Amino acid sequence: MTPAIDLLKKQKIPFILHTYDHDPNNQHFGDEAAEKLGIDPNRSFKTLLVAENGDQKKLACFVLATANMLNLKKAAKSIGVKKVEMADKDAAQKSTGYLVGGISPLGQKKRVKTVINSTALEFETIYVSGGKRGLSVEIAPQDLAKVLGAEFTDIVDE
């Protein structure tokens, strides 16, 4: 199916797969997923990649609710670097093996530091991309962190 799904199956992590018809004209991928799946946007999590200290070859991954904005200062602090900036589209796609709008935190080509916003812990399960547009994975946040080697911290604007 996708590297994300393959990883979850291989690691025997419980998850539920959800599909929906992606509108190619919609560029608000996380919002679209929440709307089409009929879930609270605070449970629909997006995957963002940043460049550490401006180096587009040294990326880190942040997973946060689609309703939130990533705070770059908090993000940098959470991974112990001076500053971060959003990774460019090509660098993100090359590092993950996924297209923008379908980037999953799971099964990326290159393993990178990953941080999940602490609001994920408010829910029994959250939704993340399954590795392509129109495919979402419902998973317990603790299981997601375990398989990614990720930490939970506050990385969003107030």
UniProtKB/Swiss-Prot annotation:
Changing residue 46 to I: 38-fold decrease in Cys-tRNA(Pro) deacylation activity. The keyword Cytoplasm applies. One of its GO terms (biological process) is translation. InterPro entries: Prolyl-tRNA_editing_YbaK/EbsC, YbaK/aa-tRNA-synt-asso_dom_sf, YbaK/aa-tRNA-synth-assoc-dom. Changing residue 136 to A: 3.6-fold decrease in Cys-tRNA(Pro) deacylation activity. Its EC number is 4.2.-.-. Changing residue 134 to A: 7.4-fold decrease in Cys-tRNA(Pro) deacylation activity. It is found in: Cytoplasm. It comes from the Bacteria. Pfam families: tRNA_edit (PF04073). One of its GO terms (cellular component) is cytoplasm. Keywords: Cytoplasm, Lyase, Protein biosynthesis. One of its GO terms (molecular function) is lyase activity. Changing residue 136 to H: 16-fold decrease in Cys-tRNA(Pro) deacylation activity. Its main location: cytoplasm. The record marks 29 as: Participates in proton transfer during catalysis. Reaction mechanism involves exclusion of catalytic water from the active site and substrate-mediated catalysis: the sulfhydryl side chain of the Cys substrate acts as a nucleophile and attacks the carbonyl center of the ester bond, leading to the cleavage of the Cys-tRNA ester bond and formation of a cyclic cysteine thiolactone intermediate. In contrast, the INS editing domain of ProRS catalyzes Ala-tRNA(Pro) hydrolysis via nucleophilic attack by a catalytic water molecule. May form a tertiary complex with ProRS and tRNA(Pro), as it can be cross-linked to E.coli ProRS and to E.coli tRNA(Pro) in vitro. It cannot compete with Ef-Tu for aminoacyl-tRNA binding, suggesting it acts before release of the charged aminoacyl-tRNA from the synthetase. Functions in trans to edit the amino acid from incorrectly charged Cys-tRNA(Pro) via a Cys-tRNA(Pro) deacylase activity. Probably compensates for the lack of Cys-tRNA(Pro) editing by ProRS. Is also able to deacylate Cys-tRNA(Cys), and displays weak deacylase activity in vitro against Gly-tRNA(Gly), as well as, at higher concentrations, some other correctly charged tRNAs. Does not cleave Pro-tRNA(Pro). Belongs to the prolyl-tRNA editing family. YbaK/EbsC subfamily. This is Cys-tRNA(Pro)/Cys-tRNA(Cys) deacylase YbaK. It comes from Haemophilus influenzae (strain ATCC 51907 / DSM 11121 / KW20 / Rd). The gene is ybaK.
